[in-house]
Swiss-Prot record:
Its main location: secreted. One of its GO terms (molecular function) is cellulase activity. The keyword Hydrolase applies. Keywords: Carbohydrate metabolism, Cellulose degradation, Glycoprotein, Glycosidase, Hydrolase, Polysaccharide degradation, Secreted, Signal. This is Probable endo-beta-1,4-glucanase B.
């Protein structure tokens, strides 16, 4: 799916890691997306504090205090590497991104680096696996000493050749490992917006992905409105959550894979509360393959957005956190 007022100064990534927080939750991971640095996608590069913002470490700390232990941090490739995927960094943007990652991992939680690009760079489908490998080799090299960083290959590939989606994911894996980042998990995403409900029909070929470190996690997204887009506060039924992840659960089991729901949400209403609770209960019954889930989304600039998980007054933080609490650490 689809913000701090001062520029954050980054610490070195290697110095910003603590031991993973101990979990009382049934899941290995449970947390939230942290949105803002990908805002203003129609204004590139845009200005910090005007078109985009970075997540606020203080509100992330509040969510950690509630028991969350994983945060998916959105950013745009075009802002990080403005000239080309293989080019030099915008050092200020990298510093801000690194600061957020450091704040998360110093607290013992996991930070997912999420290039929120939909398989595209400057509006064009990424077609060069070599360039994509280099992008990831360069970025992973910045965080290779921080084992609480997770690399998400790209957000929600869509309307792309299926073999290309496979090859881009494999190129990212190869680049990350070539950088010497060998301890971190890699989250791979699929075509058709990485939807769990379409995964079996669309993304079966991704079972061929390989990783010498055997730390691939299949990241799927699932919304509960009629078209699965997450653009409505309504949910189709009280049982739609479980129904939309059942086939993907079987696929994970049949293929010896593990997965995570990288985005989910529903409106603050009784039907969605029941549907989300049912989905999470089902995932919790299948933790051999489901390692957790992340709400969409927190972030400083969401305002009155229907799924806003930003403390202290976001609609979902106020109206949905209680149904997530059984799964928090």
């Amino acid at each position: 799916m689809k913000f701090g007022s001062i520029v954050l100064i980054a610490a070195a990534a290697g110095s910003a890691v603590a031991a993973p927080a101990k979990r009382a939750s049934v899941f290995q991971w449970f947390g939230s997306n942290e949105s803002g640095a990908e805002f203003g996608q129609n204004t590139i590069p845009g200005s910090y504090g005007k078109e985009f913002i970075f997540p606020d470490p203080s509100t992330i700390s509040t969510l950690i205090g509630k028991g969350m232990n994983i945060f998916r941090v959105q950013f745009l490739m075009e802002r990080l590497v403005p000239s080309s995927m293989t080019g030099s960094y915008n050092e200020e943007y990298l510093a801000n991104l690194t600061s957020v990652v450091d704040a998360v991992t110093k607290a013992g939680s996991y930070a997912i680096l999420d290039p929120h690009n939909f398989g595209r760079y400057n509006g064009q489908i990424i077609s060069s696996t070599d360039d994509f490998k280099t992008f990831w080799q360069n970025l992973a090299g910045k965080f290779k000493s921080n084992n609480l960083v997770i690399f998400d290959t790209n957000n929600e590939y869509h309307d792309m050749d299926q073999a290309l989606v496979l090859n881009l994911n494999q190129a990212a894996i190869n680049g990350i490992r070539a950088a010497g980042a060998t301890s971190q998990y890699i989250f791979v995403e699929g075509n058709s917006w990485s939807g769990a409900w379409t995964w079996v029909d669309v993304n079966d070929n991704l079972k061929a992905l390989t990783d010498p470190q055997d730390k691939i996690v299949y990241e799927m997204h699932q919304y509960l409105d009629s078209d699965g887009s997450g653009t409505s506060e309504s949910c189709v039924s009280t049982t739609i959550g479980k129904e939309r992840v059942t086939a993907a659960t079987k696929w994970l089991k049949d293929n010896g894979k593990v997965g995570i729901i990288g985005e989910f949400a529903g409106g603050v209403n009784d039907q969605c509360r029941t549907a989300i609770s049912g989905m999470l209960e089902y995932l919790a019954q299948n933790t051999d393959v489901w390692k957790g889930a992340l709400w969409w989304a927190a972030g400083p600039w969401w305002g009155n957005y229907m799924f806003n998980m930003e403390p202290p007054s976001g609609a979902a933080y106020v109206g949905m956190l209680d149904i997530l609490e059984p799964y928090l650490g």
